A protein has these predicted regions:
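ATP/NTP phosphate-donor binding region
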Residues: 1-62
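Nuclease catalytic cores that cleave nucleic-acid phosphodiester bonds
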Residues: 62-63, 85
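Short, acidic/small-residue loops that bind anionic groups at enzyme active sites
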Residues: 81-92
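N-terminal glycine-rich "phosphate-gripper" loop used for MgATP/nucleotide binding
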Residues: 64-69, 78
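Glycine-rich beta-strand-to-loop/alpha-helix junction loops that act as flexible
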Residues: 9, 65-67, 89-91
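Short amphipathic alpha-helical segments
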Residues: 17-19, 75-78
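Short glycine/serine/threonine-rich phosphate/pyrophosphate-binding segments
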Residues: 46, 69-74
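Short, conserved loop/helix-junction motifs that constitute active-site signature segments
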Residues: 2, 80-81
Length: 92
């Protein structure tokens, strides 16, 4: 399973982003998981990213890191895909 952290860089404080990177690194180092961190660039980008990754057919776990908008966008990207699960890391 691939773990994908979709991070809104405008949500929360800068130290919040570092904590997310630390969590991702712990998954990679301690548990040997494949991890990817992606910063969103604009409104709608999280939906686009999640949808494109889901279309690969890989087993994915998404971490929506931001506020309500980020969560909504990631959810819209993964809806309808059986190969994806999503959780929320509130930062907004």
């Amino acid at each position: 399973m691939k773990h994908v952290f979709i991070i809104n860089p405008n949500a929360g404080k800068h130290d919040s982003r570092q904590r997310i990177y630390d969590m991702a690194e712990a998954l990679r180092e301690k548990h040997g998981q494949e991890v990817q961190c992606i910063l969103t660039k604009n409104q709608g980008h999280a939906t686009e990213l999640a949808r494109k990754l889901c279309q690969t057919g890989d087993d994915l776990r998404f971490y929506a890191c931001g506020g309500d908008g980020t969560v909504n966008e990631v959810a819209n990207g993964v809806i309808g895909y059986d190969n994806a699960a999503m959780t929320v890391i509130p930062v907004g």
